[in-house]
Swiss-Prot record:
It comes from Roseiflexus castenholzii (strain DSM 13941 / HLO8). Belongs to the TRAFAC class OBG-HflX-like GTPase superfamily. OBG GTPase family. The lineage of its organism: Bacteria, Bacillati, Chloroflexota, Chloroflexia, Chloroflexales. NCBIfam families: Obg_CgtA, Obg_CgtA_exten, PRK12296.1, PRK12297.1, PRK12299.1. One of its GO terms (cellular component) is cytoplasm. One of its GO terms (biological process) is ribosome biogenesis. An essential GTPase which binds GTP, GDP and possibly (p)ppGpp with moderate affinity, with high nucleotide exchange rates and a fairly low GTP hydrolysis rate. Plays a role in control of the cell cycle, stress response, ribosome biogenesis and in those bacteria that undergo differentiation, in morphogenesis control. Residues 163-333 form the OBG-type G domain. PROSITE patterns: G_OBG, GTP1_OBG, OBG, OCT. This is GTPase Obg.
């Protein structure tokens, strides 16, 4: 993997507001009282995340973190429909997990196939023009809707590598050296722990068979709690099909190789029990050192893997490396290949469907607050400067049963009714709009 790796980011996305509907009337020479002809506003632009196989890092989001879509155009005379706002497409690497909080709950979507799209923020609906409000008894509607506000989201992005094989082991066990000799990858290599601070990918070819190997940053005890490079390490092996567990058989850092094997598997189990069951091939590395040769008999007896999955190697001299790769290729062929074919599909946040007609009423310090998707959307799309706006809200309160429910709850004359950002004075079942700043 060339360049700098960046595997998490936080962005803000804002979909476009819908355009306003028009409250206009026909003006014809011989029709002095023409009917309503106001057109609808256009939809606000959506914001999408798109899985792009050509990307491998979230680094661009270090520089740019805000994405705002275009507002829809306003409606016009002669039923002219406003133009829809342009959508925004944000490209992310395949394997990116997006998370956001909606109504206090966290939802996530996994963009694990090329071409997958996530509708991250939905553009607002265009406001209706006054042609929609004309009836036989209301032939001159002086009302049109404002555009619905577009959705706004704070989104956390996390990249989980899509590799077939993960190289795991304590820092300085030789993972980067092994990757450099089995592939064209050139990770930073040095004789001290934590040389690898970011994942590296390499493509390995065994005959006509090839697979992707990820050299993951080294693990230490407590990684499942985020100690050291813990989370950076563990999240990237979740998608691998097989692990090569590299052990410093020479114990050059003063640790016991058997304890190393047990400690890393325990960290896998504590982070995610399924990871501890992931197939492993064990490589006893640094066999070119005398200390390793002295430990081999004990290690073979103590490490609980089958003989065919235990290899003595030297990444520095390539001793035993070819046999190791043959076995890895053999194991991978036996496993079902992951389905990563392109998918032309649009996903949405997995929010449970809620009946928009539902509402709640609660007592506040000086009045009452009504909450509900449909009634709150109506308020947000109401232009209170229009003469007939309050009349429409009054009708909706009565038809929906909210007015009766408020009276049953105990609302009194003079109480204040709050819906969305608007406030109304209540008097004998009728509402009067409170101008902002007026008490």
């Amino acid at each position: 993997m060339a360049g700098e790796f960046y595997d998490s980011a936080r962005i803000f996305v804002q979909a476009g507001d819908g355009g306003d509907g028009a409250a206009t009337f026909r003006r014809e020479k011989y029709v002095p009282r023409g009917g309503p002809d106001g057109g609808d506003g256009g939809r606000g632009g959506h914001v999408y995340l798109v899985a792009d196989p050509g990307l491998n890092t979230l680094l661009p989001f270090r520089e740019r973190t805000r994405f705002i879509a275009e507002r829809g155009g306003n409606g016009g005379r002669s039923r002219k429909h406003g133009r829809n706002g342009r959508d925004v497409f944000i490209r992310v690497p395949v394997g990116t997990v997006a998370r956001t909080v909606i109504d206090g709950e966290t939802y996530s979507v996994d963009l694990d196939a090329p071409g997958l799209r996530l509708l991250a923020a939905r553009g607002g609906r265009g406001g209706l023009g006054n042609v929609h409000f004309a009836t036989s008894s209301y032939q001159v509607p002086r009302i049109a809707e404002l555009g619905e506000p577009g959705e706004r989201r704070e989104i956390e992005l996390e990249l989980k590598l899509l590799a077939d094989v993960g190289l795991i082991g304590f820092p300085n066990a030789g993972k980067s050296t092994l990757l450099s000799v089995i592939s064209a990858a050139r990770p930073k290599i040095a004789p001290y722990p934590f040389t690898t601070l970011q994942p590296n990918l390499g493509v390995v070819e065994v005959g006509e068979y090839s697979f992707v190997v990820a050299d993951i940053p080294g693990l230490i005890e407590g990684a499942h709690r985020g100690v050291g490079l813990g989370f950076s390490f563990l999240r990237h092996i979740e998608r691998t099909r097989l692990l090569i567990h590299i052990i410093d058989a020479a114990g050059v850092d003063g640790r016991d190789p058997v304890n190393d094997f047990s400690a890393i598997n325990e960290e896998l189990r504590l982070y995610q029990p399924a990871l501890a069951q992931r197939p492993q091939v064990v490589a006893l590395n640094k066999a070119d050192l005398p200390e390793a040769q002295a430990n081999l008999k004990r290690l073979r007896a103590a490490i609980p893997v089958s003989e065919q999955d235990l290899f003595v190697i030297s990444a520095a001299t390539r001793e035993g490396v070819d046999a190791l790769l043959q076995r890895v290729a053999e194991r991978l062929r036996e496993m079902p290949a992951p389905h990563r074919a392109p998918r032309d599909e649009t996903l949405t946040w997995p929010v449970p469907e809620v009946d928009e007609r539902l509402y709640t009423i609660e007592r506040t310090g000086d009045g009452w607050r009504v909450r509900g998707r449909r009634i709150e959307r109506l308020i947000s799309m109401t232009n209170f400067a229009q003469p007939d706006a309050i009349m429409r809200i009054q009708r909706v309160l009565e038809a929906s049963g909210i007015g009766a429910a408020l009276q049953e709850a105990g609302i009194q004359n003079g109480d204040v009714l709050y819906i969305e950002q608007a406030a109304f004075d209540w008097e004998d079942g009728a509402i009067t709009y409170r101008m902002p700043g007026v008490s």
